[in-house]
Amino acid sequence: MNRTIKDCVYGLAVGDTLGVPFEFRPRNTFNATTMTSGGVWNQPIGTWSDDTSMTIATCDALRENNKKIDLKAIQRNFVIWKDYDAYTAHNNTFDVGNTTAQALDRRVGLDDLYSNGNGSLMRIAPFNLY
């Protein structure tokens, strides 16, 4: 993995880790100026979320396939993350969205009206860097 990709993933992970304890809280009810624990998921300090885990899983699939997009490899890594706690900060998968869980359990994307979220936007960085 080259330096630019590492820097991008590190930046994503740090920002994500700062935000995990404050997820789902209204603005202006907290100061995210230092690493802290807790939050809705009661996670220890230094925990990143599904966003970083799935970004790392995507990078791993791209690395494994010589920078070629292999959707099956990405899907496999996402399933390993969800079911076996891979790519997590503390060997604990949490905050798996319903749409993500259903798609991974079925091994196919969903196409109903309410299955379109913003998760892909948070995991697209590796495709721009590889």
Sequence positions of predicted segments:
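Structured, active/binding-site neighborhoods that engage oxygen-rich ligands
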Residues: 1-130
